[in-house]
Amino acid sequence: MKNSDIIVLDFGSQYTQLIARRLREQGVYTEILPFNAKISQIKEKNPKGLILSGGPASVYAKDAYFPNDEIFNLNLPILGICYGMQLIAYHFGASVTPTNKKEYGKSNLKFVSENALLKDTKDGQIVWMSHSDKVENLPDGFKTIAVSENSPFCAFCDEKRKIYALQFHPEVAHSECGDKILKNFAKYICDCESTWNMGNFAKIKCEEIKKQVGKDRVLCAVSGGVDSSVVAALLAHCIKENLIVVFVDNGLLRTDEAKQVEQTFKLKLGVELISIDASELFLGRLKGITDPEEKRKIIGKTFIEVFEREAKKHQNVKYLAQGTLYTDIIESSVVGSSKTIKSHHNVGGLPKDMKFKLIEPLKEIFKDEVRKLGTELGLSPDLVYRHPFPGPGLAIRILGEITPEKLCVLRKADVILRDELKSSGWYNKTWQAFCVLLNVNSVGVMGDNRTYENAVCIRVVDASDGMTASFSRLPYDLLENISRRIINEVDGINRVVYDISSKPPATIEWE
C-alpha cells in the first residue's frame, strides 16, 4: 500500500479509530500504529505528520504509556490529543497533575492567540472533553492558543517545531469544528494532499494483487455479504482468469441466504460460483460447544479445511482471498494499550498451519470505504448497502450450544425483524439489525396456560463504520409489532427484549 500521510500512535483511546476515519474522509491516508511502535516502523511509512491519541492512563502514573522519545527528533509535525497533549507537556518538562475540576462532555473553546491549527474555526466553538488530569504549566518554547472554563492550557503549540496539543477531542462529532482542525493539521501544517479515494485505491490494489499472484490462482471465499462481494468484484476486475469463487453453506446462514448468494454472483456480478454444502460438517463440529471464542476458531479452521479440499480439485491454487477489514484487524489484535476484543474467524480464528497464502485487499480500509469501493466497481446499491452479516453466521447469535432446533427458531424470528424494518422504511436507515437467541427461558402466559420458553433479543444499531455504534431509536409502535409477531408466529418464544447498549462498551454482536 502507499506510504501513510499521517500516522496515529494509539494510546488506548476509544476514539483512536475516529481520528483515522475523519482524516481519510478528507482524502488523507492515515494509519494507526501502537504507541510503542519502533522508529524504524514509523520511518518505513514515510509519514508527513504524527498524531498522539488520547488514552485512559495518566502520564505521571507507574503504568503510563510512553512512545519512543525519538519521535520528537524526526522533524515531523506532531499533534497531541488529550493524553497525547499531556504527554507532550510532560515530555518537554511541564507538570501534569490530577484535577479537582474534571471535564467530561461539552465545553467552550476561547481563543488566546492566532495559529495555523485553529485557523478559520469559530471562537467560542463547542468542543468535547474527557479528562481528569491537567497541565499545570507550559514547557519552554510553547504558547497557549486557546483556553476553556477549566483548562487554562486547553490548546498550546510550539510553532517553530510544529508541535501542537489539544486537551479536547476534535475527532468526535460533538466537537463543532473538529473536522476543520484536523484538516488544518494535515493539509496546512503537514502539507498532505487529498489523494486518498477508492478509485485510486482500486488501481493501486489491483497492481499489487497482479504482482503478488503472478500466474498462480486465487480461491476467493464469499458469503454474499458486502465485504466478500467487494473482494470478489475487485479480484474479477484484475485477475478474473485466475480467480475461483467459492461459497460454503455452513448451515449457519439466514433463511434463503444460500439461494440469494448464488443469484447475486451469477446474475449481478457475472462471476462463476462454486457452491459447497458443508452444513453437516460445521454443525457436527460445533455440537456441545458453548464458548464464543471456541465457536469462532472451530468455524475458521473448518472453513480452511473445506477450501483446501476444494483447492485440490484445481491446479495452481496458492492463495485464499477474504474480506478482512481494518476494523477486524484492530479488534483481533492488541493495538496500543487496548486488549484483544474478540477473534474474528478470518483473523485470529485461522489455523497457523493452513496451506494458503492470504490475500486481504480490504484490510487497510473501513466499512464505509468498502461501500464506496463497491460503488466504484459498479456493484448495485442493494448489494453495497445491505446490512453486515458475520462470517460465523448465526453461530454467534445463539448463546450457548448450537442446535438445528435453535437455528430454526432464530431464522424465523430474524425474517420477521427484517420484514418489519423493510416494510416500515427503517431497514435502510440503520447499520445492522438482527435477533439473538438468548440462552435463557422465562415464564409467560399464553391463553390460560403457563409457558416457560426462550427469550429473543432484538439488536438494531446506527453506525458509520462499525467501530462505534449506538442503538437505533425505533418507534415504539414498530417495536411492538416486531415483538407481537415474533411471539405469535415463532413457536418456542414467549419474550422479546430490545438491546439499548452502545459500542463501546458493548460490541455490536453478542459473541
UniProtKB/Swiss-Prot annotation:
This is GMP synthase [glutamine-hydrolyzing]. It comes from Campylobacter hominis (strain ATCC BAA-381 / DSM 21671 / CCUG 45161 / LMG 19568 / NCTC 13146 / CH001A). ATP binds at residues 223-229. Disulfide bonds: none annotated. The keyword Ligase applies. It catalyses: XMP + L-glutamine + ATP + H2O = GMP + L-glutamate + AMP + diphosphate + 2 H(+). GO terms for molecular function: ATP binding; GMP synthase activity. Catalyzes the synthesis of GMP from XMP. It is an enzyme of class 6 (ligase). One of its GO terms (cellular component) is cytosol. Residues 5-195 form the Glutamine amidotransferase type-1 domain. It comes from the Bacteria. The active site is at 82 (nucleophile), 169, 171. NCBIfam families: guaA_Cterm, guaA_Nterm, PRK00074.1. Keywords: ATP-binding, Glutamine amidotransferase, GMP biosynthesis, Ligase, Nucleotide-binding, Purine biosynthesis. Its EC number is 6.3.5.2. Transmembrane segments: none annotated. Residues 196-386 form the GMPS ATP-PPase domain. Homodimer. Pathway: Purine metabolism; GMP biosynthesis; GMP from XMP (L-Gln route): step 1/1.
